[in-house]
Amino acid sequence: MAVAAAAAAAGPAGAGGGRAQRSGLLEVLVRDRWHKVLVNLSEDALVLSSEEGAAAYNGIGTATNGSFCRGAGAGHPGAGGAQPPDSPAGVRTAFTDLPEQVPESISNQKRGVKVLKQELGGLGISIKGGKENKMPILISKIFKGLAADQTQALYVGDAILSVNGADLRDATHDEAVQALKRAGKEVLLEVKYMREATPYVKKGSPVSEIGWETPPPESPRLGGSTSDPPSSQSFSFHRDRKSIPLKMCYVTRSMALADPENRQLEIHSPDAKHTVILRSKDSATAQAWFSAIHSNVNDLLTRVIAEVREQLGKTGIAGSREIRHLGWLAEKVPGESKKQWKPALVVLTEKDLLIYDSMPRRKEAWFSPVHTYPLLATRLVHSGPGKGSPQAGVDLSFATRTGTRQGIETHLFRAETSRDLSHWTRSIVQGCHNSAELIAEISTACTYKNQECRLTIHYENGFSITTEPQEGAFPKTIIQSPYEKLKMSSDDGIRMLYLDFGGKDGEIQLDLHSCPKPIVFIIHSFLSAKITRLGLVA
């Protein structure tokens, strides 16, 4: 995960549209150095604006800016600026298109390159420079697979001299954007590779150095149409400013970077590849910033769930799995001696608890979670005092245990606020109970007294053990017992299940031929759901 850390000294806070709005002077940590930035929080974005002159930062003597050129001739502020060495594989930058890899024969030679714009993605380039920067218009990024990249004739560091014959050598940055926008579907670029411009293409303001990228423009936006206005949907960069969309970001504390002074907060990208860390002058201000950003992110969840449902259609994630709730949690990394956590996207459907490493963008990705646990075989086993919470003295963790054929699988999660903790624990418990009512009955093969049988557990009717029917015969019921008669249940953790209904035969021993834990957990879920339905627990 690329970590760009930002530090915050809070400014005035306000409210608008029912969501928190806030602005203030902050600091941003880029390549191990802190830099002041102005941070503005809106309903759906966090905007970082450079407060340090780009001239002092990159030695050019002027400010820098950048624009991404896309979409059927449309140009809008986009992923311009320098890119750290860990930039995603889908983007060519000055760190991937090294000067020594560019043929010497084209250096400082004018070339004509014809580019056919794509319906989605447009030219697929980012540009920097302009008359106001005393620099030519330079290609600073090329998105792989899009129009410019497909020509195999354009390079990061190419100066654009003209567009369809229109001279850009004395153009401002905005004039160049407009020229590219009006160029039509077939674009003839006159370019010249400038090795001496490589440092300029690489560097920008501290804000432009923050590693935060969205997928290439041709990727479908979550739940949105291809005609959605890009300005509010995608990451943007313009005149030393970056706007980070908050939708499905993960806002947390003390995960990517140690915070002994308790004055930092972290914003993780939906793809879990990048992190921005904000730091304030004191812990109280950090908490205020955290609460405001976290609140805005939470307010966007309803829209996200609706978009995911629309994206997945009637079938849901897989066979009528309707999404009931989703969101980010911190998950304890197993096997670590210290409390180390990682982001986990947790999704609750009508029947399952799903865990993803990142927010799926394409429909197919929803069908490949890292873990899938049936709620019927899952129980909440811990929610209360413990260690490792983001706020000193406050524990916000809970654990789940699931009975599987491999044994019991446990996950320890951490919520960010008490409200989040209550919502998640309530949703999981209710999900288990609803799943019990929805599924109503499970059965499994077993051996009882050396006879092949079938154990059936029904939500309403309790337990029954029947013989496996022989050809031409009906199954015979050996044991039928309601839940009220169950005195005790246990297992050996390997294959044996023990049930005691208080009858003359005493304890019943059933060989399930596999790990009994799923059945044990399902019995617990049925009992818990029935007790809750009867109002015996609050």
From Swiss-Prot:
Cellular localization per UniProt: Cell membrane, Sarcolemma; Cell junction; Cytoplasm, Cytoskeleton
Protein origin, superkingdom: Eukaryota
Modified residues (Phosphothreonine): 214
Main location: membrane
Membrane topology: Peripheral membrane protein
Post-translational modification: Phosphorylated by CaM-kinase II.
Subunit relationships: Monomer and homodimer. Interacts with the other members of the syntrophin family SNTA1 and SNTB2; with the sodium channel proteins SCN4A and SCN5A. Interacts with the viral HTLV-1 TAX protein and with dystrophin protein DMD and related proteins DTNA and UTRN. Interacts with DTNB.
Primary role: Adapter protein that binds to and probably organizes the subcellular localization of a variety of membrane proteins. May link various receptors to the actin cytoskeleton and the dystrophin glycoprotein complex.
The protein's name in its UniProt record: Beta-1-syntrophin
Gene that encodes the chain: SNTB1
